[in-house]
């Protein structure tokens, strides 16, 4: 069985389920709190309350350009719909990677099924949680902020896997810690952090996750004591 294709199909179905549910429940116009403000600044390219959300504003403006003026609020709400559905997709991929890494690499049929089941259950449980669903159907920065966070986490885990594979291929040869081809993902992650702060500063918290993953893969050893790690 072509498990790569199966994984792609399941991930696609998870994305479509989330997208369909969010689209069916999206707010037709402005919701409470900051939503009206974000719709206005995106449509008119104006300035929001500090610290601002310039990248969100530009994306919202792009979506509103394909809608009639009376449907601008609905079009900008769709930014959250699409971003949240992509976040659910990335959550599925992250859980699958975590399960496969815990398994030491999925080789048997039951291992693939376990990884897929974990990804589907985890991502859909997250998708239909109250707080996430609430932000997925209105014009708020939190949906696209979560997308950036999930994307950075997934890219960092992908870097970790590819870096380990490259290190194994080197067979113990000396190399510079930044000398792997997989490190292009680190450059992309740094770029995404720059974009993400144009949405919400909360995304910067993912830097600690990236730093720990880099430390564990590059400098940590199984025989290290706690003092040696610090």
Where are these regions (language model features)?
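Membrane-interface transmembrane helices that cradle and orient dolichyl/undecaprenyl
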Residues: 107-113, 152-186, 193, 212-229
